[in-house]
Amino acid sequence: MNKIVVSDNIKIENMIYEIRGKNVMLDSDLAMLFGYETKQLNRQVLRNINRFPENYCFQITDTEYISLRCQNGTLKNGRGEHRKYLPYVFTEYGITMLAGILKSELAIKMSLRIVDIFITMKNYINTSLIEQKYFNE
């Protein structure tokens, strides 16, 4: 495996997308953050598929992939442009499980950071909804 160095300045928030009403991250982004190649990460998932029910991980459809590519310039040329297979996406639960099967220090460190970001986003959304409800009354 090639050694990949991940900067602390990476904006993980920009790697979180909404698909099927769930906040998810792409397999390619997680592979980069965890220091793996995408095919290595997906191979580990498929070997441990019983640990990844659909609310943890799922493969997106052609339509979802096209929509994702169009979403705010997501997946710019050169990054995911010529994928052989449709990407897998992972919810926060799947990301935690993924770190457990990869068992690298970097994967564990990054998964903790990612889950913290998911929680922060949920708290922000909940606070915004409460404020909106308060001001609308």
Task: Identify the function of each model-found stretch.
Residues 1-137:
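Basic, low-complexity intrinsically disordered segments
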